[in-house]
Amino acid sequence: MLALGGVIFLASRVWSLRGRRGTVLAASDRTQTFNGSALTVGTYNIHRARGTDGRRDLRRIARIISGCDIVALQEVEGPRLGSGHNQAWHLGQWLRLAAHFAPSRKLFFFPHRGNALLCRFPVSRWQRLALFPSTGRAH
């Protein structure tokens, strides 16, 4: 019983994650070569897809960022039970963009929340770094 209580306690803690490297982004086959003279770059805190009206609507977020060639997103939810995909993956599918979800912490041993990058162009290498060590809900 004590061991089960220990596992539940550890699982419910928020854990920060280490950096990683990679060579491709999810759905990179959908990217296109940059041929223009202008590039639209955006950043958006999606607040887990909750708008100022309190409604959660990820498709509304997709409409807002649809004109960006590259967009960085903050407060992106990780995979949900049942779907197995994070919000960045869904946005990438709908907008036909390569997507990378970078969880900043785990909860119940799974990626919980983090940042994301969506890109219309091929990415040959990526790296995410933990900017500072952090624990707890304050980060």
What does each model-identified segment do?
Residues L39-I46, R60-G84, L118:
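Active-site beta-strand/loop signature of hydrolases that rely on acidic residues for catalysis
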Residues G5, F9-F34, R50-G54, E75-H139:
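Structured beta-strand-rich core segments of catalytic domains in phosphoester-bond hydrolases
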Residues R56-L58:
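N-terminal G-site of the GST-like fold
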Residues L2-G5, V41:
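Enzyme catalytic cores with a strong preference for nitrogen-chemistry domains
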